[in-house]
Amino acid sequence: MNTALLAKQSLIEQNQTLLARFKAKTPIEELVTQRCQFVDSLVKQAWQQHGLDQYPIALIAVGGYGRGELHPHSDVDLLFLFEGELSKAAETTLSEFIAFLWDANLEIGHSVRTLDDTLRLGRDDITIATNLLEARLLTGPETLFDQLYDAIRQSDFWTSSNFFIAKRDEQTARHAKASAFDLEPNIKSCPGGLRDIQTIAWVAMRHFGASRLEELVEYEFLEPAELEELLECQHFLWKLRFALHMAVGRDENRLLFDVQRQVAELMGYEDATQLAVEQMMKRYYRTVRRVMELNEMLLQLFKRATLGHTKALEIQAIDDNYQRRGAFIEALSDDLFDSGEEIVRLFVHIAKNSNIKGIYAPTLRSLRRARRAQLQPLQENPLCRQAFMEILKHPRGIAALSLMHKHGVLSAYLPAWRNIEGQMQFDLFHAYTVDEHTHRLLLNIERFSQPEQKEEFPLGSVLINQLPKKGLLVLGAIFHDIAKGRGGDHSKLGSSDALAFCKLHGLNDHDGRLVAWLVENHLVMSVTAQRRDISDPDVVADFASKVRDAVHLSYLYCLTVADICATNEKTWNNWKGSLLRDLYFSTQRVLARGKEKPVDIRARVREYQAKAKKELLRRGIKEKDLDTLWQRFKADYFLRHQPNQVAWHAEAILKHKQVDEPLVLVSKHTTRGGTELFVYCQDRPKLFATVMAVLDNKNINVHDANIMTSKDNYALDTFVILEQDGEPVSQLSRIQSIRKALEKALASDNPKLPRFRKLSRKMKPFNVPTQVSFLESNRHGTSMMELIALDTPGLLAKVGDIFYRCNTTLLSAKITTIGERAEDFFILQTNDGLQLNETQEHTLKEALISALSAINTESTN
């Protein structure tokens, strides 16, 4: 049998053995060492079998392999070191050896160099230099290896200071490419990942000559507790990487959605109150946060040790206990934080001094020591509460809260915060852990106060400065999601927590109730704006009754916008901004007018018609033609469209000469942050489904639909559409393509609909059970239905087809996509113009669940 195949089989069998030992909870350190030793044996045996031991070539392991750590599918990095020139025979044999290792299914990284070339390249490239630091001789001339070993430890190879600067800059560049809290993190290169631990080890190796992290304790650079924490973090990340390699069967460091469940299972997690995958990711996010803090502190200490005080930092006294050293705050006593009050007082000074951006490393070390020693929550201490309220009331309080969160003091102060640290939700909507999302929400509140944000958040920038007490909004933000992961309604549970906190901290009853109300209702404005018909006066009146007054409305608006923007980078767009602003101003008018005075519907219709007619007459449209056209339209049409929309539609219809052909309009300007699409044609079965199928094929998102029929059975359907990135459809060629595709489909009595797109890789791991619920309708003769389902391609077209088959007419729709979930709201009636009865509701519900659940199952398999 081919020896390469035998080697390949032996590696497969060894991986199976390693996996069995991993499942049996063998320490991961043993497994990565065992893997390395096995590869050592295989490589050295192959070296001898190829007769390479007769040549003066040193076979050297470098990089992670040189460290003696190998995960199941890690790269095997080799340096073939020689002096002078290689003979042709040696070159040929070496090529055959490398090919053998590839055939054996080892991921080989290799270089063939002379000693002089190796040192020259190492001096020019920090990556090569780092790999050489971990060089380990496998076989070959020891004297040649010793020359390399001695040369790379000379100061003229890389000075300790230059090496530190290069590795620090390398890390900064790497961190800029990804967040520690990505949904699909790279566990090796993300901030707080394995590379950050290795960076500490590399800098130590270069500066102290240390070969292991443990030696840093001997050099009194690392405290025993810090070493234990670093090794504990490394242990978990190694286990995670090992399981990831086993799950995907290749060298992979990205923890992608489609393997997270399998990795969690291999790690031994089981579904309980929290999903297994959420438990695993919570541990991961907490681990990387710890690594990030240790990395920051130790590299700051290394900087002092390697660079010294090359540039004197400005020192400014703050009080008897603190001073500012450059951009860092420094405690003047190592035992200052033995008083719990001073742990919080530190951040009061940070809030008060805009020049402070971080904590000086020795002070951070003292803070970490004191934080671990706390036996009860800091909020139990009255002096801590007093200091915390100072932070909350200060204009720069959020900057201080941000650092409190970063360094674990917020969780030491507020026990409930600890519960949400690292808490993720296994979905595509929440891009961050609950604590990181809340942290970003706080930063958004801070952004609203900045003049440069007025263009992006025009209303929020005004309201934030009009709030009676900004600190109450900050408290509402801190508590809005604090009860997530406990089970039950997190809004109500969080509201109770918030009220208790306010009482403990001496807030008056009014302020405490306002904060609790904000927490309990933090989703109400978002849901109303995005999933209800806010052109309906009854919807706005109902929302106004929940809001109570203009002050509550302003607080809720600011919290809602900051919350949406902090959920993920793609959630906020101009369309959502316009919906929330419209709801804000509509509610403001209701509150100013008084909820008891309803809108005069007839007066509004006359007002809108008059404004539209004035503009149309100015454009040369004949009043007689206009009156004739509008007599065909129902009053509801004028209520649901602004005067400029009414004018746009009317002018196009009156100028449309091919009356038997469909009219499709796509606005060249944005309408409330989106692109408006208008379809006018003879109404017919499956019209909505046809339009949805075409738009899906064009990769267009539909966010709003108003489905209307004239008295003489013409469709007057309006849609708000956006590109996949949330931006309006603006390219002229794109607009023309959409219009032509719709005209072609609508011109046929039996159109051939395009095939739906395939489900994306990210969507496949998710299974959203289809839910259909009917709500109490406040509009005569209509039914209101909510649909929750997996957001599969062509979903709305399929829903429209089911409406047709169930003899149901769609009047309007609000389309909301929350990650992998579609949460859509429809206003329906029977084909006879009546409200659906219980039997009809049941039939429609069963048809939707049956059809969409089948699609859900097909898509995720």
Curated annotation (Swiss-Prot):
Protein name: Bifunctional uridylyltransferase/uridylyl-removing enzyme
E.C. code: 2.7.7.59, 3.1.4.-
Molecular function via GO: [protein-PII] uridylyltransferase activity; phosphoric diester hydrolase activity
Lineage, opening ranks: Bacteria, Pseudomonadati, Pseudomonadota, Gammaproteobacteria, Alteromonadales
Superkingdom assignment: Bacteria
Keywords: Hydrolase, Magnesium, Multifunctional enzyme, Nucleotidyltransferase, Repeat, Transferase
Cofactor: Mg(2+)
Organism per entry: Shewanella oneidensis (strain ATCC 700550 / JCM 31522 / CIP 106686 / LMG 19005 / NCIMB 14063 / MR-1)
GTP-binding listed as a keyword: no
Function comment: Modifies, by uridylylation and deuridylylation, the PII regulatory proteins (GlnB and homologs), in response to the nitrogen status of the cell that GlnD senses through the glutamine level. Under low glutamine levels, catalyzes the conversion of the PII proteins and UTP to PII-UMP and PPi, while under higher glutamine levels, GlnD hydrolyzes PII-UMP to PII and UMP (deuridylylation). Thus, controls uridylylation state and activity of the PII proteins, and plays an important role in the regulation of nitrogen assimilation and metabolism.
Positions of the UniProt region annotated as Uridylyl-removing: 318-675
Activity modulation: Uridylyltransferase (UTase) activity is inhibited by glutamine, while glutamine activates uridylyl-removing (UR) activity.
Record family assignment: Belongs to the GlnD family.
CDD domains: ACT_ACR-UUR-like_2 (cd04899), ACT_UUR-like_1 (cd04900), NT_GlnE_GlnD_like (cd05401)
